[in-house]
Amino acid sequence: MLTLRTKTTSPLSFLRLDAGLFAGNSINRETDSRKDFIGRLGAEKAIGDWGKWGAGFSYYHGFVYNPTTEAYEMRGNHFVKRDMGETGTYMKRQYLGLDGQFSFLSSLGKTTLRAEGLIGTQPGIAGRSKSPNYSTRPENLPENSLFKRPFLGYFFYLVQDIGASPFSAVLKYDVYDPNTKVSGNEVGAENSFTSKTDLAQSTIGIGGI
């Protein structure tokens, strides 16, 4: 991985660029020689002695192995089957991300606000929007065919320290839409090849750490 920063005396010292080419995901062994690109341009700066802000833009570009001779892509509000002609083709996986955070000190303790959003394309399978994590090459079976979905996800965090105590209250709201091309009654429509896997979901969480 390559990291670029200016000298601390530079007016641009609050910027940082990280980028690299990676093989595999460090979970299962790599099954091909393709590399994925991951990059992030971030900024972080203090506001006096009472606060700090940060923001970033990230980009991911990679590929997912398709073990079958078929694949599915969205056309309008339904999937269309494609004949790939052979096994061992690849589908593009691409993410664009934005993140930001702001923290400040007050009589209540430290308050941190954080938000992050991702959009892109995610090849999954019929019953799961997450990309397959193969440790070995799977068989040429229909259930292993890739489904390419345009997705959107974002979350908001509020973390409030409780005075000088070691405890914090946390409020979180997150949304994940695995397929932005369909919604409501369109999901599961006849001959659309969509299913509950394509349903959007959102959650609100309250807790402490």
Which sequence ranges carry the predicted segments?
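Surface-exposed coil loops of outer-membrane beta-barrel proteins
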Residues: 1-42, 68-83
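Outer-membrane beta-barrel pore domains
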Residues: 51-61, 66-209
